[in-house]
Amino acid sequence: EELYEAGKIKAIGVSNFLPHHLDTLAKTAKIMPMVNQVFLAPGELQTTVVEYAKKHDMILEAYSPLGTGKIFDVPEMKQIAEAHDKTIAQVALRWSLQHEFLPLPKSVTPSRIKENTELFDFELTEEEMKQIDQLDGVVGKAKDPDTTQF
């Protein structure tokens, strides 16, 4: 908070905070975090975290937006990608953006890095978004920060 107030940092962020963690933080914080970095990917839409973030104008930074690679084995994602002449990765990243998440895909391959930026010449339909939202569990589940040793 001191660094933020002094203008030395532009934002305050947390990682893997659930709503009850943020509520606890709110009791003592002068400035609430602007960003919460959490595992968000097609198949893992952490609804309570998403709703809390929207209610409190908090940006959700989606780490592992490609479901640690598991998303490439999901037939529904392949079907949607083919319908748009896009890759599964592009569809997953577009899904993130349309949910107003900030996706952080990891790649060291120049062609994939470029491909990951080619997301603004198409949109997923409302029906496609719902279809992807309902892919519960296909990429695994986010670790519970209350019980996981990080």
Model features per residue range: what roles?
Residues 1-142, 146-150:
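Beta/alpha (TIM)-barrel catalytic core signal, keyed to glycine-rich beta->alpha loops juxtaposed to Asp/Glu
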